[in-house]
Amino acid sequence: MDRWLIWDWNGTLLDDVGAAVAALNRMLVRRGAQPISVAHYRRRFGFPVRPFYAELGVDLAKWDWDEICEDFHSFILEEPQAVRASARPALERAAAAGFRQCVLSALRQDKLEDGLASAGFLGFFAHVFGVDNLDGASKLQRGRELMARLGELEAPPILIGDTLHDAEVARDLGADCILVGCGHQLPERLAAAGWPLAADLIEAVELAAAASAKRGM
């Protein structure tokens, strides 16, 4: 019987919070807004990103949205970012526990595949589902397409992510969810979602294995 883990990429397997804030601040300053701290970012960041950018002082009526997104993604490529040290051990542990694994991300498909290939992670995943845009839209739709690809399941897959949006996506898809508190949103924000909260990726896999065992799988 297949048991599936659905991994988020940015902020979950990839430790890119610092890079995201640095790129965001460059984009903000270019448009006359004030830079923010990592702590402020983790307190306020959310999906969709348009309201978040407006909250930070970006005049969305003045600035072209596609240019905003292109600036951010251009800037973030210039910032240091790396997969979490626990990412490979967590993926290996999940595979050893009998899980099949896939990725669902709000990152554009080509950038997602490039990132996974660079990390040497593609071999862990049966499916890799990113989006077709730069503003993080349509992750939910891609999740629905992924669920269709997985077919009829005897137990819901478990989505591991780092944002309240991941929790929302999981609920819509009928998946279970485990949130990790080391990513783009603070743990106290994630706790409000009502899903199990892990401190790191290893604990997330352990929670997933325990949940699967309770189902007798």
Spans of model-derived segments:
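Acidic, Mg2+-coordinating phosphoryl-transfer loop and its flanking beta/alpha structural elements
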Residues: I158-L197
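Short, acidic loop-to-helix structural element flanking the phosphoryl-transfer center
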Residues: I76-V103, D110-E113, L140
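Conserved H-loop
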Residues: Q34, L122-A126, L153
